[in-house]
Amino acid sequence: MKALVAAVVLALGLPALAQEAKPLEPGREVLSIPYEKYKLKNGLEVILSVDRKLPIVSVNLWYHVGAYHEAPGRTGFAHLFEHMMFQGSKNVADDVHISLLEQIGATDLNGTTNYDRTNYFETVPSNHLETALWLESDRMGFLLDALTEEKLQTQKEVVKNERRQGTETAPYGLANEKLWHALFPLPHPYHGAVIGSMKDLDAASLDDVKGFFRKWYAPANATLTIVGDFDVAKTKALVEKYFGTLPGGPKPDKPQVAPVKLTRETVIRHDETVATLPMLSLAWHSPAYLTEGDAAADVLATVLATGKASRLYKRLVLDKQIAQSVEASQESLGAQSAFTIEVVARPGVSTETLKKEVDAVLEELRKSGITQEELNRARTRYDTQMLSGLESVGGFGGKADVLQSYNHFIGEPSYLAQDLARYQAVSLEDVKRYANEMLRPDARVVLHAVPPPQAPAAPKENK
């Protein structure tokens, strides 16, 4: 199941290209989040939504830039800049941005980067909204005034350490990166890791970083969303006060890239040096977020590997007891998505054995599809996940995030009802068609990650 913070429809960024959703089932309540959207003269988009359940306000700022937008040889810049944004600006001292927010009682305070966007968010008591807006505006408009070579070098080392811990010394970390590289080969912008490569991080100069900021961190390339208990007129005045005077500029062009198409099965072997158990990973290209087939892919991922009754878990973990764990997911991204299956073997079980069993499950799905009970369970899971997030104004999956996500993907913040409806509209035939058309054995990447003692038994690569 995708997170709402997952991606932006860049190459397909028009409302008309969103997956058409049928009406909700009769008797289902039509949900919506009331909002007002407008734009400042400098191009900054603003979305306001009042929610008076609690005296708090979520400030959520999205910049329309992620790893997808990075130039060759500049991987990791979007994520590196997420770090730099907390290091102080012209009117905010070094390393006090977070502490200033914590002093006023901020929660859900963070920044995240993925392939399609970078965001910054915090939830504050309503009477401290102005402080949060001032802090966000100061780093949007005046970060470069305080950016130094020393700060850059410090954060480069922090990010490089993150890469060591999250990729290079993490179980299957390098294996997963190798799989992704094969699924999205150069020159596709999804090829590089969000965290970047050591080589590119080492090469990043102060001038490079400043140029990245000037291009992508302009008001015209950002959306500010405020959700919670606030006075609309006063908040508009505050937004104008702190953001309206920032210089504008053109909205940067987004890369336009043709979808990648696999024409054969690509087999990759990886000698796993961190984990002690073999792992099998399979990956296919899949429809972009909110386009036709995206919801069916989510449903199928749930049927395959969510819960003890799921197809792969029941067969591989419970019945045959050859797998330690199974995962399946539709990683929905803006330009093109990825459907992945990951199985960790039990001791003594080869990845070839896992592959045969996974293929047997997939072939059964292609022939017979899923059951109505499985479809209903997947629908309920998505509804529950979505609606539970809406209980909060901020944080991951909260109202501010939801409004930002839909606005980011299709330019329309009020897509909640349609999003829920598209899952209700998925039919048994839709899922069967997806399995047959998208999860073909002749258009996928298969990775065998095997620890050294068992490595000789792993299949040879055919790259």
Question: What function would you assign to each model-found segment?
Answer:
Residues A3-G13:
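Sec-dependent N-terminal signal peptides
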Residues A11, P15-L48, D231-E272, M279, ...:
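Proteolytic maturation boundary segments
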Residues E20-E36, H181-A222, K254-P259, A288, ...:
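Histidine-acidic residue clusters that define the catalytic metal-binding segment
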Residues I47-S49, L54-P72, G76-L80, D94-F142, ...:
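M16 family metallopeptidases and their MPP-like homologs
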Residues F77-M85, L300:
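Active-site His/Glu-centered metal-binding helix of metallohydrolases
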Residues Q87-K90, G141-E150, I370-T371:
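Short, polar/flexible loop-turn hinges at active-site or ligand-entry regions and domain interfaces
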Residues E149, K156, K210-Y242, A443:
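Non-catalytic, conformational "gating/processing" segments within enzyme and secreted inhibitor domains
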Residues R164, T169, H181, K251-A309, ...:
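His/Glu-based metal-binding/catalytic segments typifying zinc-dependent metallopeptidases
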